[in-house]
């Protein structure tokens, strides 16, 4: 893609297990500092970046003191699901979309992988549906057969409704 004049950018959560020094992550001040509203709470977005020089590719790390900083991926050290995994997924989805907007980069395609990114298409097509930047953006979702044993918070539907996402788009979560 890059060799043909396109751009590939990667967005991942900055989990606590990612070594910032080894991977030369640094905070992008001009892109950080956005407050994302998650279930009526103001949550500051911290954006860090690293590059893959050989591929001429940027990797953006969506970070949050509350949701990712000192945490593992989906389970805590006692192998229990984090109780706020739903909020973490909402934060990641909104953080990616808001970062793309701040970059003023209209992607042709967004490829979604894994549980933490699973709400991104829902937000893109509902919460951000009137944003002209994403008017022609296509979304591909890769599904895997690695089920998470456990349940999301029962209030996840209410948290999504807070962002004015319609009931008809949430029926699978009921």
Segment roles from a protein language model:
Residues 2-174:
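Catalytic cores of nucleotide-sugar-dependent glycosyltransferases that transfer UDP/GDP/TDP-activated
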